[in-house]
Amino acid sequence: GFSVYGDYAPHTAMMRSFSRGNNFPTQYPHYGGQDVKYHFMFQFLTGNLEYLGMRIDIAYNAVSSLSLWCFFIMLYSMAKRFFGSMSAGVLSVLFVVFRSGTAFFRFAYEHLQAGDLWETLAGNTAFIGYTPNENWGLWNFNVYLNQRHLGFGLLMAALVLWIFLDWVEESCAEKDKGILWLKNRFLTKKAWMFKKPNTALFAGMLLGLCSFWNGAAVIACLLILMGFAFFSDGKLDYLILAIVTVVFSEIQSKMFVWGSVVSPSVYFGFLAEKKSLPGIAVYLFEISGIVFLGVLVLLFFLKKMERAVAVSILFPTIFAFVASLTPDINVNHKYIIISYAFLAVFWGGAVSRLFHWKGAVGKILSLILALSLTITGIYDFAVILKDNDSGHRVSVNLNSGLTSWLAENLKKDDLILTPEYSINEVTMSGVMMYLGWPYYAWSAGYDTYYRAARAVEIYTTASAQVLKKTVEEEQITYILFEEGMKFEEKECREDVIADTYPLVYQSDDGRIRIYGTKE
């Protein structure tokens, strides 16, 4: 559908590189010939399922849906553990699926003023939002639909957090109160001594092995665990977990990545219009309503353990507003999404408790609170349904003649120069493109500007010598020319390419021609 196909492009290309190719050691299909700077194990699994005979859509949907469903079960279980209520668990999941935010209220007000609210609500197929890139679906359930590997990462993170809730629970059961209780979390032998080092070792291995399933989920989990460690005894167990996680992550990085996996930098303010603490507070209120700022009020009504966990869950969000690990700051939205998902547990508990407070008044207030926490997400979900119905589809022939020829004739070390394709018959062949859609590779940390300039040189040069020299330097083995194509808005010349290299493939309609550059 229209709301998800953009993110499906790099996922499906990577999956096909395993099912129809031999992409190991792994390269990034939209920037072939280099190491992989992207967590790809989800695509590796689904690609291998297709290779073993499962339809690609079934493999893709089965793994991601089961992972997300199991994560929801973990959220439900956490809410029930904290609040002893099934309704708290159900509400927690609903608050993740239907996000909070101010967008719907502002949208409704503007169109009430214009007198076209009902027509707009019925006909609109675009996400609403008034903050940068909110109309991408940056904060709603669409994130889980297009980033299918996120559910698995969240599930593994939730399992590790569930294990270490025992540490927090035991420490919060101590009878000391206030500053004395907090002091004893640092100034006693028990605060540091091992409790269950074997369990910590296992959890570290599990989390570390997930680094190439979803790196953001692993980092967010470590940040939350840092908060757990602050409020827990047995801090050396947390140290074991952190060290083992980093070691296992580094081992995988050395296997798959030639250089650095991340490019860390200080970046204050994320996407907030005003890069200040008040500006960040306003931004958080706009994108999430009361979920983040309101938790500061909730802390006064929570028990000691619940407070410790809620504060810890804020750490990934704090990280998102002060640091960046990739060239694309938008990627930090995942840390906020992860914090939001776990904070939903406490809002589920709050609404559930309020419903049982002081008869009818409590019930009315809880319904108002629940509606305010979901109305924006409910409308977003309606947009998702409309934008992915039968009239809003992007279709690709998975077994076209072009796809089959590329899969059969191009090998792992071949590199094909193409237009800047996102998702089409070429990407579905699993081949390594010199430069696919630039945003995917750029946001993963590749130098797309360099390759774009070289590609322009190849497609536009009038000199056969320049063409051959550039192709040889870039180790390009095939050049694809599409009838009437432009590259970076520049007119392309086929005549020089055709005079220099032999034609090795032409599509049935003559629109696509491929030239081989290998001697």
Enumerate the predicted regions with their spans.
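Active-site lumenal/periplasmic loops and adjacent helix-entry segments of GT-C-fold
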Residues: 1-156, 176
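Membrane-helix boundary/interfacial segments in multi-pass membrane proteins
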Residues: 2-7, 52, 136-148, 251-287, ...
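Hydrophobic/aromatic-rich transmembrane helices and adjacent perimembrane loops
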Residues: 65-68, 150, 219-222, 329-354
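Hydrophobic alpha-helical membrane-interfacial segments at the cytosolic entry of transmembrane helices
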Residues: 91-93, 233-255, 290-291, 309-310, ...
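Membrane-interface alpha helices of multi-pass inner-membrane proteins
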Residues: 141-146, 185-192, 199-215, 226
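Hydrophobic, aromatic-rich transmembrane alpha-helices
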Residues: 159-170, 220-230, 286-307, 353
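Membrane-interface helix-loop-helix junctions at transmembrane boundaries of multi-pass membrane enzymes
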Residues: 170-199, 232-240, 295-314, 357-363, ...
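Extracytoplasmic
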Residues: 355, 359-519
